[in-house]
Amino acid sequence: MSQTHLSNQKFADLPLHPEVKQALAENGFEFCTPIQALSLPVLLQSKDIAGQAQTGTGKTMAFLVATFNHLLSTPVPENRQLNQPRAIIMAPTRELAIQIAKDAILLAKHSHLKVGIVYGGESYDVQRKTLDQGVDILIGTTGRIIDYVRQGIINLGGIQAVVLDEADRMFDLGFIKDIRFLFRRMPSADQRLNMLFSATLSMKVQELAYDHMNEPVKVEIAPEEKTSKNIKEEIFYPSQEDKMRLLLTLIEEDWPEKAIVFSNTKHSCENLWSWLEGDGHRVGLLTGDVPQKKRIRILEQFTQGQLDILVATDVAARGLHISDVSHVYNYDLPDDCEDYVHRIGRTGRAGNKGVSVSFACEEYALNLPAIETYINHSIPVSNYDRDALLEDIPPPVKIHRRHPAGARNLRERSGAGRPQGAHRSGGRPPRHDRTRRQP
């Protein structure tokens, strides 16, 4: 983590439970990020917060540290039943819930607290076995949690800490009725520690906070900056004919270590995957139609470096905590201005540098003025040399073709890695001999 991303506040200097301090130290957490430095002193006084921070600022660890500390420092409710978790963390997507659970397990190592996760797309029975053994911290999506509550498998009467993550996304996905349903089945707000985090604290999000929290303290981190200064943004105006060739050329020229390509529709994502797969890249596809187990496997492969490119709809734009994403490509400009911010927020995280490349094509160029108004700046325009675009592009593969197990043809991973300018056989010129930009 870059030192410029950290504050001067040390975790060791905060009045945290010894088991929490030990887990933080063992996992390399010494200094707080700004959102952690602002929120933890408030939360450690058992005061509720409504926090606003950009993605990648460490808010997940902020609420996890507060949750673990609160449970370890607070007596267990009298007559607590096995089906009563002590804390509940609600997330809008399965991917975010899974990532939160992974981070929670790091903190749980030295405590007696059990972490459980539930979400749709997986077997009820498998998840129920975990719940039947009792969990202290329940992490999940609202729909699956409600299913278990209605069946009596989960009872929320013993909740002592509540986290609502990505609250604005909850509104976008229509989950607010579910959230209110769950809040009504918990102890009153003054009997629990309540935490809400959101990329934006809109009026509707603040209303939700004040309805179900106990006089929350508002914590904000640089709300005026919707995009990180660590992200280099640029935009091209390709013709529809040039669009795919330009993307393939940019990827070969930039040669990103880890990239996400966003498109607006499932069909477009499948088309992108087919061309990238056909061009020899190690690429995964993440859309709403991909089965849950396959989605998890793809995310793990991407996180572990077995895939270099992830093609995704906006289902993956929020909540994915994947380190070292070097490039984000907006093949289509999103219709929603906030989606632009959340897409490019996948890179430039934790103080690292990132690159965002967007296409303002004939179909979606009309979205650009609203996006630039929303982010309060113009995106620098880059021109490209049409004669320098790739010509010898292999045909796309069919979507049902299984991903090859071998390494990406373009990149050699043995020894010192891919030599500069390495390329496929077939007469393609080295990447550094071709440039996309025009002076």
Swiss-Prot record:
Residues 40-219 form the Helicase ATP-binding domain. Its main location: cytoplasm. ATP binds at A53, Q54, T55, G56, T57, G58, K59, T60. One of its GO terms (cellular component) is cytosol. Gene3D superfamilies: P-loop containing nucleotide triphosphate hydrolases. GO terms for molecular function: ATP binding; ATP hydrolysis activity; RNA binding; RNA helicase activity. It catalyses: ATP + H2O = ADP + phosphate + H(+). A motif (Q motif) lies at residues 9-37. PROSITE patterns: DEAD_ATP_HELICASE, HELICASE_ATP_BIND_1, HELICASE_CTER, Q_MOTIF. Belongs to the DEAD box helicase family. RhlB subfamily. HAMAP family: DEAD_helicase_RhlB (MF_00661). DEAD-box RNA helicase involved in RNA degradation. Has RNA-dependent ATPase activity and unwinds double-stranded RNA. This is ATP-dependent RNA helicase RhlB.
